[in-house]
Amino acid sequence: MDNSAIFEEFNSKKISQDDLEATITSLNNYFVKLNDLNNQYINLIRQDNIDKIEKQNIRQQQKQVKVEIKKISATTKLFKQNLKLAESLYKKIKLTNNQDDINKAKHEVEIAKSMLLQLKEVINGQGKSIKLKKLSDIAIEINHLSFKYGPEFPNAIDDVSFTINQGEYVTIIGHNGSGKSTISKILIGVLNAQHGEIKIFGNIVNDHNIEQARKFLGIVFQNPDNQFIGSTVEADIAFGLENKRIDPKKMPDIILDSAKKVGMEWALKKEPLNLSGGQKQRVAIASTLALDPDIMIFDEATSMLDPKGKREIKEIMVQLRETRTKTILSITHDMDEILNADKVIVLDHGKLVRVAKPLEIVEDKDFLRNIQLDVPFVGLVREELEKKGIKIASTQNIDELVEQICKK
């Protein structure tokens, strides 16, 4: 039986994929606009002299945008009707016993269901699927941040402010309890600060946009075992890409490229848990790199590794620094690592006590010892040589130190 007339009528009435994409694009554009207005409003109310007219204008614009979002959200009804239309088509075609046409009609039902679900996800997500714009070249800006774990506890973070520029490699150091890991948890949204603000590329992070802001971030934790989900290295890297809804056709190249960047392309078919500690951490870094975050946070990423593993991870971090395509924030106990950084942030009992170049920190051995931090190895060697009357110029690594000694 020829069902072409039935399909022709259906095609003239159905909602297309282009219609869905146009609806979602329009909706996301309004969510982006609302986020920008929220940023403007927050910045305005924090000023000493608030312009009441400007405040009223922003509030009015926020209301107008919310009305538009509500209007577009109401189109869900049309997509529900579209699903009913496809289901009606399927019922009609099923009666004809033409299997090819039945499969074709069934596929139309699946498409209509998928489109309705996609639209609902965007609406229910309230803009969580949008990508925030970069409003500034400052990757991370923390202003007067304070946090305590409970009313009876002292501040774990006490009025801390600092900035990290796009492409910088910055380390945060401090003894146990200094607050460095707390800052990491606040940045990724695990904890909420009681006071102060965080900006990611100029976007003020708040309850409404935390999910979008986190898309700028990739994090490598202390214990890579906790990050493994897949049965192979390849599957583990793929897991994050699937969650990000990357085109499956593009995934093999992305997986291979990220594995090559950390020297683990040979292990793609291996089980992650059977690898060495350093290799596991390299896989964790590859999984993060595959998602292409603008900011990479290394939270004590070398603390559980043997010396060989530590060296391998630090070499990867230096390679990333040299590309200047990623902003690197490393929270670390490893005092030798700070020599690779552009800038060092020092915390003590929740307070920011110093921001300086690595060599400035290494040179001030009394300062480090007063806040219970180890002096990096090159600093200790220089100190011992100076005691014996041998003056050595400041060096940032062991190779430079050996070269200086050989010249004596």
UniProtKB/Swiss-Prot annotation:
Protein name: Energy-coupling factor transporter ATP-binding protein EcfA1
A GO CC term attached to the entry: ATP-binding cassette (ABC) transporter complex
Broad EC category: translocase
Entry keyword Kinase: no
Taxonomy, superkingdom: Bacteria
Keyword S-adenosyl-L-methionine found: no
Any one Gene Ontology molecular-function term assigned to this protein's record: ATP binding
Membrane topology field: Peripheral membrane protein
Known role: ATP-binding (A) component of a common energy-coupling factor (ECF) ABC-transporter complex. Unlike classic ABC transporters this ECF transporter provides the energy necessary to transport a number of different substrates.
Annotated Gene3D superfamilies: P-loop containing nucleotide triphosphate hydrolases
Oligomer and partners: Forms a stable energy-coupling factor (ECF) transporter complex composed of 2 membrane-embedded substrate-binding proteins (S component), 2 ATP-binding proteins (A component) and 2 transmembrane proteins (T component).
